[in-house]
Regions:
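Hydrophobic beta-strand residues in large extracellular and virion-surface proteins
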Residues: 13, 27, 33, 64-66
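Conserved PDZ fold ligand-binding element
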Residues: 22-45, 203-204, 208
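Transmembrane helix recognition focused on a "late"/terminal membrane span
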Residues: 2, 17, 28, 90-119, ...
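PDZ/PDZ-like groove recognition
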Residues: 5-18, 22-23
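PDZ-domain C-terminal substructure recognizer with occasional recognition of PDZ-binding tails
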Residues: 1-6, 47-93
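Membrane-cytosol interface at the C-terminal ends of transmembrane alpha helices
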Residues: 131-159, 172-196
Length: 262
């Protein structure tokens, strides 16, 4: 690829170093860096590293737009990625530019990262990387919002027992629990999700939970969400399933023919 083509090419991740920041934010090989703070990025690998380091020195977050399997998503990062890159070819570059032209642009101050936790049957739980004041003011309400019903029941029973023993003991326990829930709410939700058999799958930046789920659905058409406005995806029939259906229909035809002969 000549220098002119390279200057109009995107950076594609060729490999991700172990324990790198890119590994932490769940980037994958063949992901393409499309835009830097909503501006198409053609400046090359060295410029990307320098710009990310400069942003970190200024304690500023960076909004990267990533292309994965021809789908775009945003990601907020704070630091250099730690990847090796190659350049996209002219055909891929043009296709991504056309896709980006149709993308809705959000100011990065409006966005937060959302962690997508997935189990083996594509059931997703989406956790916002931001603090919710309700966790510090009224923990049971926060637990109910995140559908942690068993924990809410346990918390309520313990609170009732404490208040029946001594009001001041209850008050001290409530304050300590509220502070802990507020400061460690993301870690708590991630831990609950891991205990339920889910694992980290994806991180996307979005302005709200609904749009985060839509973005995840685009990247993983099989994704299912509990208590969501999105309907569960229709079951995908594979080629083997098609053959099974055809064989079943053929057997039914043979059975009907045999019955008719009898």
């Amino acid at each position: 690829m000549d220098d002119k083509s390279k200057s109009q090419s995107f950076l594609k991740i060729e490999s991700i170093r172990k324990r790198s920041y890119a590994h932490t934010v769940l980037l994958k090989e063949n992901d393409v860096i499309v835009a830097f703070d909503n501006n198409l990025f053609f400046k090359g690998e060295k410029a990307l590293i320098d710009d990310l380091i400069e942003q970190k020195k200024k304690e500023k977050k960076t909004l990267l737009t990533i292309s994965r399997n021809e789908q775009l998503f945003d990601l907020i990062v704070i630091g250099s990625l730690g990847c090796d890159f190659i350049s996209t070819d002219s055909e891929e570059t043009e296709k991504i530019k056309q896709t980006f032209a149709k993308k809705q642009i959000w100011d990065k101050e409006e966005l937060s990262n959302f962690f997508a936790m997935r189990d083996l049957t594509n059931n997703f739980e989406v956790i916002k990387d931001d603090k919710n004041i309700s966790a510090g003011i009224f923990p049971p309400l926060w637990l109910a919002y995140h559908q942690k019903w068993s924990l809410m029941v346990i918390f309520s029973i313990v609170s009732f027992l404490l208040i029946s023993v001594n009001f001041w003991v209850f008050l001290i326990g409530w304050i300590c629990t509220s502070i802990y829930c507020y400061l460690a709410q993301k870690e708590l939700l991630v831990s609950f999700s891991l205990l339920s058999g889910k694992a980290f799958s994806l991180i996307v930046a979005s302005n709200n939970l609904e749009n985060a789920e839509k973005c995840i659905r685009q990247l993983n058409p099989k994704s299912k969400f509990k208590y969501s406005n999105l309907q569960d995806p229709e079951p995908m029939i594979s080629e083997n399933d098609d053959n099974l259906v055809e064989n079943k229909e053929e057997k039914n035809k043979i059975s009907k023919t045999q019955e008719a002969i009898v």
